[in-house]
A protein has these predicted regions:
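Alpha/propeptide regions of enzymes that mature by internal proteolysis
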Residues: 1-305
Length: 305
């Protein structure tokens, strides 16, 4: 199989928004064409998606439920053992680049203030304002939360609550819950690649998934959950992170591939693992295949030399 790259824009992004994924894939493919390795290709692709502004990553990241907090996660991994991740990172436009630089350290994961200081020391600290889309999405989420506050006050929590009542119950932002409500007025991007030398790599990045508590970290920076790469291929996941974590989904798919399951079948089997109604999407690449699978159509691209 020729050098190949696959990108996606998250389960919330319909195919009509795939142009950003195509641009990202082209940039990554250029790296592969220049004989740079798969890791450089996927980082380049994801950095493009982070800079786009439409996707829930980088400058397009969704605000926390207090209306001002931006906590970003990202990770990279390749089949030669390089691994780096960041979680709850603030004031950085390209967390995927910070994750890549962590592969040069003895560590694999930095979080919060430590991750931000690391970004500052390597010249990647770059504060930014929430995008227009992020501000609009925040208003939409707050409207939903306010409805839960008005309609469910005093009612017992239910499984159908979708987390809104529980988020209010355990609210832990410095701003009060009511102040956030009064201010009212899912997605991860990713790339997987195979280079001409047969090496695989994956990169993922997200701005989080409201409604969520301050400090929430889900699948994106957790190895084997939102991403995995090894000698047999690379996998990236997107969707409701807690469900992905509970199934260690990326590593689970990778194990199926090792056992001989074709890539497309493995991706579709992963989707079937999660309950109906749970948004989920995956991309993957092996020595012979490159595929996208999702519960509902999502923005993505596949390019090869």
């Amino acid at each position: 199989m020729a050098a190949t790259i696959v990108t996606h824009g998250g389960t919330d992004m319909p195919p009509e928004e795939k142009d950003g994924c195509e641009t990202a894939a082209r940039l990554g493919l250029q790296k592969l064409g220049d004989r740079q390795d798969a890791l450089e290709a996927v980082v380049t692709a994801v950095a493009s998606l982070e800079a786009d502004g439409r996707y829930d990553a980088g400058v397009g990241s969704l605000m926390g439920m207090d209306g001002k907090t931006l906590e970003l996660d990202a990770a990279v991994m390749d089949s030669r053992g390089r691994l780096g991740a960041v979680a709850a990172l603030q004031n950085v436009r390209h967390p995927v680049k910070v994750a890549q630089r962590i592969t040069d350290t003895p560590h694999v994961l930095l979080v919060g203030q430590g991750a931000e200081e690391f970004a500052r020391r390597i010249g990647l600290h770059s504060p930014f304002e929430p995008s227009v889309k992020a501000q609009r999405k925040f208003r939409e989420y707050i409207a939903e939360m306010k409805k839960a506050h008005d309609d469910d006050e005093g009612a017992e929590d239910t499984e159908e609550d979708d987390g809104k009542t529980l988020v209010r119950k355990f609210w832990n932002f410095p701003t009060s819950w009511q102040a956030a409500v009064d201010r009212a007025g899912h997605g991860t991007v990713g790339a997987v690649a195979r280079d001409e030398a047969g090496h695989f790599a994956v990169a993922v990045s997200t701005g989080g998934s409201p409604p969520a508590l301050y400090g929430r970290v889900a699948d994106t920076p957790l190895i084997g959950c939102g991403f995995y790469a090894g000698q047999h291929g690379a996998i990236a996941c997107t969707g409701i992170g807690e469900h992905i974590v509970r199934n260690m989904l990326a590593r689970t798919v990778y194990e199926w591939i090792i056992s001989g399951t074709p890539l497309q079948a493995a991706l579709e089997r992963a989707i079937a693992l999660l309950p109906q109604g749970i948004d989920i999407g995956l991309i993957g690449v092996t020595a012979t295949e490159a595929h996208v699978a999702a519960r509902k159509p999502m923005a993505s691209a596949i390019l090869a030399l």
